[in-house]
Amino acid sequence: MIDLQAFLPYRLAVLSEAVSRCVSQVYGERFQLSRDEWRVLAALADAGTMKSSAAALHTTLDKMQVSRAVTRLEQDGLIQRSEDPGDRRNRVIELLPPGTALVRKVVPLVEARVAFLLDALDPAERSSLDAVIAKVGERAQQLIRQG
């Protein structure tokens, strides 16, 4: 049998969900944004105008999740879709000023939650956490590429 409490994928999934729920309370309750909508807004704020396919990669959401989030955000006047000047078959999405303003309101609140979580660690532990996440992430990507 498997010991889930010692199984790395399970432990990471539980941690990821807990951290995500802590953060999503901020934008969900106060700003009525879903997790997917927030991820799209944050990706656009970070990387700028992008194709929906790039948003899917940037947010780790699937195309349908991105499509639903983009539709709602567009309806709320936070983003806009437009024709890709380089390829008229594609559409690009970009933040509108109200979307940028919303991100500016949400980010400090999210950062405060993350700071609270990380305050449990001393500086050396934080540095180690960053290094471990990077190393395990690189190895996971290596296995994904290998198939």
Where does each model-flagged region fall?
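Short alpha-helical elements of helix-turn-helix
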Residues: 9-10, 33-42
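Pre-recognition alpha-helix immediately N-terminal to the DNA-recognition helix
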Residues: 22, 39-45, 101
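Charged, amphipathic alpha-helical coiled-coil/dimerization segments
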Residues: 26, 49, 71-134
